[in-house]
């Protein structure tokens, strides 16, 4: 499998389906991930090939090329839109119907610029949770395009402009694509994730990050553990689209408590390379997270030993200790 060097992410262990072509930037720049027809073309060369670490990878995301990623049969396109300092919004475009949605628009202008560039309207706004850095663009986008806001029924009073309130196990349709609603509390009480089984993609907001999980602002370790366990039960080739570009700092923490994990070592080096090139590390894959994310591996003896977690501690207790260690970690 050929490695991708110019345009990549943590999911770029999947072969690009066509040659990369330079494109003009959208403010601040946009990467378009086309989830087109085809089967998974390969899984993580990273597992067998060491990659060199590059320095100074914490700069803002700037993406000037587009890359098509073969996944499963689907007409859904997913476009990554950097917002604020380290947030990602995601534009969803169904090729068959032209329907467009956006997940977690923290601000309106970058989303409007991306839509205008492709002469597209906006039909839906999907929010994973109520925090302003995920809903800040709701009202302006709704006012301009007449888009309907989709969110958690538990956060009905906290999501600006909400029109459709969904609860756990609901199935909502986006232009013929079935969307499974998963309640994933922990970061907030009303957090939900949007799972598109036909595209093997999940939007996890601030519940699951690459190599980490969200801070426990409103929930408990028990809630976060249950949420993460639900998410990792999805197929290994599921692409994970989270709310922030935190992977570089997360990798440093993960290595500090599990320095002998060779898969993590290679992935951390690859992440550093991407950030040095000002490229996103998102999407990641479920398989990679299961192998490297300490919050998904709370029973691991090396992690427990590094943090002094008692053998008698259950997984929720261990997750709470790991979360507190991450909160206090200085790279």
Curated annotation (Swiss-Prot):
Protein known as: Probable hydroxyacylglutathione hydrolase 2, chloroplastic
One GO term under biological process is: methylglyoxal catabolic process to D-lactate via S-lactoyl-glutathione
Compartment(s) of residence:
Plastid, Chloroplast
Task: Tell me which CDD domains the record gives.
Answer: hydroxyacylglutathione_hydrolase_MBL-fold
The protein's annotated pathway:
Secondary metabolite metabolism; methylglyoxal degradation; (R)-lactate from methylglyoxal: step 2/2
The EC code for this enzyme is 3.1.2.6
**NCBIfam families this protein is in?**
GSH_gloB (TIGR03413)
Top-level EC class as recorded in UniProt? hydrolase
What organism does the UniProt record list as the source?
A: Arabidopsis thaliana
Annotated binding of Zn(2+), by residue? 129, 131, 187, 206
- Where substrate is bound, by residue? 244-246
Recorded hits in SUPFAM superfamilies, A to Z, give: Metallo-hydrolase/oxidoreductase
Record GO terms (molecular function): hydroxyacylglutathione hydrolase activity; metal ion binding
